Regions:
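N-terminal leader/linker segments that initiate helical-solenoid repeat arrays
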Residues: 18-80
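Structural signature of alpha-solenoid helical repeat junctions
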Residues: 27, 70-74, 112, 152, ...
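Conserved alpha-helical positions within TPR/SEL1-like repeat arrays
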Residues: 40-45, 77-88, 114-126, 152-166, ...
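Amphipathic alpha-helical segments of tetratricopeptide repeats
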Residues: 58-65, 100-105, 139-145, 179-188, ...
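Amphipathic alpha-helical protein-protein interaction segments
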Residues: 326, 330, 334-337, 341, ...
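Catalytic cores of enzymes
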Residues: 528-910
C-alpha cells in the first residue's frame, strides 16, 4: 500500500520541483531528477527500477548539498523520495535520516512539511520508537485539515490507530481506523489494499476489547483478498486464542507464511503452552530466535523479541526454573521499556516516556512480581508491583475518554489486590515499618482515579492559552456525552452509524486537544504526576473526633483501614462472600419495608454489626464521626442504618456522624469548614402541582423547596434549559424531582425536568452530560429524587451513578437517595437539614441531626427505610459560620409557615 500513496504525493508537490538551480549544473540535475522520478512512478516497479531511482535521487541530493543549496525545493523533494524508497525497502533507519533531513531544511511549503511528518512518524513507529512517532504524527494531525490529501491522511490515521492499539487504547485506535476507512470509501477511486488493511486493523481492535465474534465476521469477509491473506490468517488465530479455542487458533496460525510474518511463531508457542505442550512451545520460541535477521521480508523487531522472552519466561516457570524465568522476563522488560537496560532481576523502570507497547510492559512487570512472590522474595515483588502500578496509572491518565479508562480499571483491579496482599504480608513479617501505610496507599491510589484525574485537570491554573484549551476539552466531552445519549434511543442503522462517525470524530479531536494541552509543562506535570497524600497529610485533614474508614474488597477478604490523628489500623474481615450476601439482604430489607410495617433486621443485622460495625468502632477508638471510603457492594450500603450495638436497640445514626468519599485523596484541598459562602439555593420542583409525560405528581416536592432563599423554578418553569443557564450561580442546588438510574447502562440514567415541546433529550439531564459540565462553583447538590446513588458498581472506582457524575463535574458534595424514597419523609428530613445547616453545623452533622429529628417526631414510619436513603458524599464541612445564622432564622420561619410539619402519607418516587 505504501507506493500507491506516492502518486498522490506527486500531484501535491511536483509543480514546484523545477525551481532548482540554473545553469548547466542545474539543467543536468533536473534531467537526472526527472529520470529517477519516472522510475519512481512506474506502475509496475521492481527492485531494479527502485534501486536505479534511489541512486538517482541520492546523486541529486549529494550534489545539491555539496553546492550548499540548502532549502532548495529540488533538494527537499529528492530527499523525501529517497526516504520513501528506503522506507518501502524496509531500511527504516536510513529512511528516518532522509525524512529528518527534509524537516531540518525547514521547507516553506506546509504541504511538504505535513507529508514528511506523516512519513517520519510512520517510520519511527516501524522502528518501535513510539514517543517520536507520536510527536511527529500529532504534529501532522494538526495540519491535516488544511490539505485535501486523502492518501496521506489515511496513512496518518491508520498509523495513529496502530500506535494507540499498541499502547492498549484499543477504543481510541478503532476511532482512527474507522476515520481512515471513511476517507478511503469517500475517494474517487477505491483503494482496495488500503480498505482491507484498515478492516483488518478494525477487527483486531475489536477482538482486543473482547468482541471476538465481530472480529471474526470481518476477517471471514476478507479471506478472498490474496495480498493480505497472511495477516487475516494471523489475526483470526489471535481472535480464537482470545476465545481460548487454541486448537482453532493453531489451525489458522499454521496457514501463515513465516517469510511474511515470522512473529506468528510467538503466538503458536503461546497456544501450545495453553494446551500444556511445553516441548512444542519451546520449539516455536527457539525457531523465531533462530530466524532473526534472516526472516526474509518479514521483520522481527524488539516487540517480537520481547514477546518471545515473555512467553519463554512462563514456559520456564512451569518447568520450575524460576531463575531462568526471571532472566527471560527481565529481558522482555528491557525490550519493552525502550530506554531501560538492567539485566539483573531487581531493576525496574522508573519512567515510561521512552517505552512502547505499554500494556506488554505492564504484563511483564506483573509476571516478574508474581515470580518473586512465588519465591517468597517479597521485597523484590513489592518493588516490581510498585513499578507496574505506576505504569498502570500513567497509561490510564494518557487515555482521552473515561470509557477507555474504566475499561482499563475493570481489567486490572486484580493487580492492585495482589500488590496489597504482598504489602500486608511484609507488614506481618516486619511490624513497625511503613508497609502498612504503603498497603493503605495502594488501595487508595486505585480508588476513584478517573474522578480524581478529572478534578485535578479542572483545577489546573496555567497559562490563559492552556485554560482556553481546557474549555474546548470540556465542550467536546459534553458533545460526546450528548451523542451517547442520542444513540440510546436510535433504532435506524444508518442514523446510528452517522452518530457513531460523529462521535469518533469528536473523540479524535478531544485527543488532539489533550495532546496540545500536554505541551504545557505545568499541565503535563499535573496530569501525569503520580504523587498522592500520605498518612500524615490525611491525618492533618481529620478532626480530633474523626476517623477515616477505607474499605478494600479483594481475595475473599474485606480489608478495613482506619486512619485517625494518632495512627493507622488495619482489620481483615474474612468470609467476604458471606458479608456481601448479608449486605445485599440488608438492602433488600430496607427497600421492601412497607408503610406501617415493622423493620426486622434479625440475624442479618446482628452479623453485620459483629463483622463490620464493631471492628470499625474498636479501631476508631471511640471517635464518633466516620468518613467512609467504600468499595464494591459496600458503596450501596448506608452504614447509618446498621445496628450500633449487639442488642440491635440503637441505630448507628444515633451514635455516629457519617459521610462518604469516593477516595481519601479527595480529602485534601477541600474548602475549610465554617467559612461562609454566598447565600441562596437554586431549587427545582418540576412536578409539584402536576405530573407530565410519564412522571407522576410529587406534591411534597413543592413544600420541600418552599421558602428557601435564592431562585426557585416550579412545574413548567423548571426546565433543563434553565438549570444549565443558572446552575453555577448559587452554592447550593436542590433538585426535588424524578430520576431514573440504570444498573447496567449508565448512559441511560437521568434527572427529569419539566417536559417541554422539544425532544426527550432536551428535557432530561443524562449522567454523561453531567460529565461534560464544570460545577466547581457549586458546593452542594441535593437530589431528593429516588435511586440517584444507584448504578453499576465498578471495583475501586465506585458506583457509576448520578451522584458520582456531580462529583466528577466538580461539585463539592451531594446528598442523594439510594432507593425509592417516601415523598413526605424526604421533605421533612431535608427541611430539618437546612435548619441545622444554617445554624453552622457541618453538612454531615446537619444530615444526622435531621434524621434524628425525624426519629423523634410523631411519624408513623420510623424504620431506616424512611430515613437512611439520604446519604452525603463529598466535603462534609459547614457551609455557614455559626455567627451567620440570624438571617436564616427569618428564612426558617418562612419555611415553617409555607410548609409546616407535614403528615406522613406514603408517596413513593419513581
Amino acid at each position: 500500500m505504501g507506493r500507491v500513496a506516492l502518486l498522490f504525493l506527486g500531484l501535491l508537490l511536483f509543480g514546484s520541483v523545477l525551481a532548482g538551480p540554473g545553469g548547466p549544473v542545474g539543467d543536468r540535475l533536473l534531467v537526472r531528477y526527472r529520470r529517477a522520478d519516472s522510475l519512481f512512478h512506474l506502475d509496475r516497479s521492481t527492485r531494479v527500477t527502485d534501486s536505479l531511482a534511489l541512486a538517482g535521487f541520492t546523486a541529486v541530493v549529494n550534489e545539491l548539498e555539496k553546492a550548499g543549496a540548502r532549502g532548495d525545493t529540488l533538494l527537499t523533494v529528492a530527499l523525501l523520495k529517497r526516504g520513501i524508497l528506503l522506507d518501502a525497502g524496509g531500511d527504516y533507519a536510513r529512511a528516518r535520516t532522509a525524512y529528518c533531513g527534509v524537516l531540518g531544511y525547514r521547507p516553506a511549503d506546509d504541504s511538504l512539511v505535513f507529508v514528511t511528518q506523516v512519513y517520519v512518524g510512520t517510520v519511527y513507529y516501524n522502528l518501535d520508537r513510539f514517543d517520536s512517532a507520536s510527536y511527529f504524527l500529532l504534529r501532522a494531525e494538526s495540519l491535516a485539515g488544511r490539505f485535501n490529501d486523502r492518501d496521506n491522511s489515511v496513512r496518518l490515521y491508520n498509523t495513529l490507530g496502530a500506535l494507540y492499539c499498541d499502547n492498549g487504547n484499543f477504543r481510541q485506535g478503532r476511532n482512527y481506523f474507522d476515520h481512515a476507512l471513511e476517507l478511503v470509501r469517500g475517494g474517487k477511486t477505491y483503494d482496495t489494499a488500503a480498505a482491507v488493511s484498515l478492516q483488518i486493523n478494525i477487527a483486531t481492535a475489536s477482538f482486543r476489547v473482547g468482541q471476538y465474534e465481530d472480529a471474526l465476521a470481518i476477517y471471514r469477509q476478507l479471506l478472498g483478498y490474496r495480498p493480505l491473506r497472511d495477516y487475516v490468517y494471523e489475526n483470526m488465530g489471535r481472535a480464537y486464542a482470545g476465545m481460548e479455542d487454541y486448537p482453532s487458533a493453531l489451525a489458522w496460525f499454521r496457514r501463515v507464511s513465516l517469510r511474511e510474518i515470522p512473529r506468528v511463531l510467538n503466538e503458536m508457542a503461546n497456544a501450545e503452552l495453553r494446551l500444556n505442550r511445553p516441548d512444542s512451545c519451546r520449539w516455536y520460541l527457539s525457531r523465531l530466535r533462530e530466524l532473526g535477521p534472516s526472516a526474509g521480508s518479514g521483520k522481527i523487531g524488539p516487540l517480537d523479541l520481547g514477546l518471545n522472552a515473555f512467553y519463554g519466561s512462563e514456559e520456564l516457570s512451569r518447568r520450575g526454573d524460576v531463575g531462568g524465568a526471571l532472566k527471560e522476563v527481565q529481558r522482555a522488560i528491557d525490550l519493552f521499556a525502550g530506554n531501560f537496560n538492567k539485566r539483573d532481576a531487581y531493576g525496574n523502570p522508573v519512567g515510561f516516556s521512552g517505552a512502547f507497547a505499554y500494556y506488554r510492559l505492564f504484563d511483564a512487570l506483573v509476571r516478574k512480581a508474581e515470580l518473586h512472590n512465588g519465591e517468597k522474595n517479597l521485597e523484590a515483588s513489592y518493588a516490581t508491583y510498585s513499578a507496574a502500578l505506576s505504569l498502570l496509572r500513567y497509561i490510564e491518565r494518557s487515555y482521552a475518554t473515561d470509557e477507555a479508562k474504566l475499561f482499563l480499571k475493570k481489567n486490572s483491579g486484580i493487580v492492585y489486590a495482589e500488590a496489597l496482599a504482598v504489602c500486608l504480608e511484609l507488614d506481618r513479617r516486619h511490624p513497625g515499618g511503613d508497609y502498612l501505610e504503603q498497603a493503605f496507599l495502594i488501595g487508595e491510589r486505585s480508588k476513584a482515579s478517573v474522578i480524581t484525574a478529572n478534578l485535578e485537570e479542572k483545577a489546573f491554573m496555567g497559562a490563559p492559552e492552556a485554560k482556553g484549551l481546557l474549555g474546548q476539552v470540556d465542550n467536546y466531552k459534553y458533545r460526546i456525552a450528548r451523542l451517547n445519549v442520542r444513540s440510546e434511543g436510535v433504532t435506524d442503522s444508518s442514523e446510528l452509524a452517522a452518530i457513531t462517525r460523529e462521535k469518533e470524530g469528536d473523540e479524535i479531536e478531544l485527543l488532539r486537544l489533550q495532546k496540545a494541552l500536554e505541551q504545557d509543562g505545568e499541565y503535563y506535570r499535573v496530569k501525569y504526576g503520580d504523587a498522592s497524600p500520605g498518612i500524615r497529610d490525611l491525618q492533618g485533614e481529620l478532626g480530633r473526633n474523626q476517623a477515616l474508614v477505607s474499605l478494600y474488597a479483594a481475595g475473599g477478604v474485606l480489608h478495613v483501614f482506619v486512619v485517625t490523628r494518632d495512627g493507622l489500623r488495619h482489620v481483615a474481615v474474612d468470609s467476604l462472600a458471606r458479608l456481601e450476601r448479608d449486605v445485599e439482604a440488608w438492602l433488600e430489607k430496607l427497600k421492601a419495608t412497607g408503610s406501617g410495617g415493622r423493620f426486622n433486621g434479625g440475624a442479618v443485622g446482628q452479623r453485620l454489626f459483629a463483622a463490620l460495625v464493631k471492628p470499625i468502632q474498636e479501631a476508631a477508638g471511640g471517635r464518633t464521626e466516620w468518613v467512609i471510603v467504600p468499595d464494591g457492594v459496600f458503596a450501596l450500603l448506608p452504614f447509618e442504618s446498621l445496628y450500633a450495638d449487639a442488642t440491635g436497640n440503637q441505630w448507628l445514626v444515633e451514635t455516629t456522624t457519617i459521610s462518604y468519599r469516593f477516595s481519601s485523596r479527595l480529602l485534601s484541598g477541600e474548602p475549610s469548614s465554617g467559612k461562609s459562602v454566598g447565600s441562596g439555593v437554586l431549587s427545582f420542583a418540576p412536578f409539584g402541582d402536576r405530573g407530565a409525560d410519564v412522571f407522576q405528581r410529587l406534591p411534597a416536592s413543592k413544600e420541600e423547596i418552599a421558602g428557601l432563599p435564592g431562585l426557585q423554578w416550579l412545574d413548567g418553569q423548571a426546565t433543563k434549559e434553565r438549570f444549565l443557564a443558572t446552575v453555577n450561580q448559587y452554592p447550593i442546588v436542590h433538585l426535588a424531582t424524578h430520576a431514573v438510574s440504570s444498573m447496567d447502562n449508565a448512559a441511560g440514567s437521568f434527572i427529569a425536568f419539566y417536559p417541554g415541546k422539544g425532544r426527550t433529550i432536551d428535557n432530561r439531564l443524562y449522567l454523561e452530560e453531567l460529565y461534560g459540565l464544570n460545577l466547581q462553583p457549586t458546593r452542594l447538590v441535593i437530589i431528593s429524587a429516588c435511586e440517584t446513588g444507584q448504578g453499576e458498581v465498578v471495583p475501586q472506582e465506585g458506583v457509576i451513578s448520578l451522584a458520582r457524575a456531580f462529583a466528577y463535574a466538580g461539585c463539592g458534595s451531594t446528598i442523594n437517595s439510594l432507593w425509592k424514597a417516601d415523598d413526605q419523609a424526604t421533605s421533612l428530613i431535608l427541611k430539618r437539614f437546612y435548619a441545622h445547616l444554617r445554624e453552622g453545623e457541618t453538612k454531615a452533622r446537619a444530615l444526622q441531626l435531621a434524621k434524628l429529628d425525624y426519629l423523634k417526631s410523631d411519624a408513623i414510619d420510623k424504620s431506616p427505610s424512611f430515613w437512611a436513603h439520604l446519604v452525603l458524599t463529598g466535603d462534609s464541612g459547614a457551609l455557614y459560620s455559626r455567627r451567620g445564622w440570624v438571617l436564616w432564622v427569618v428564612i426558617g420561619l418562612a419555611v415553617m409557615g409555607a410548609g409546616g410539619i407535614v403528615l406522613f402519607l406514603k408517596r413513593r418516587r419513581v
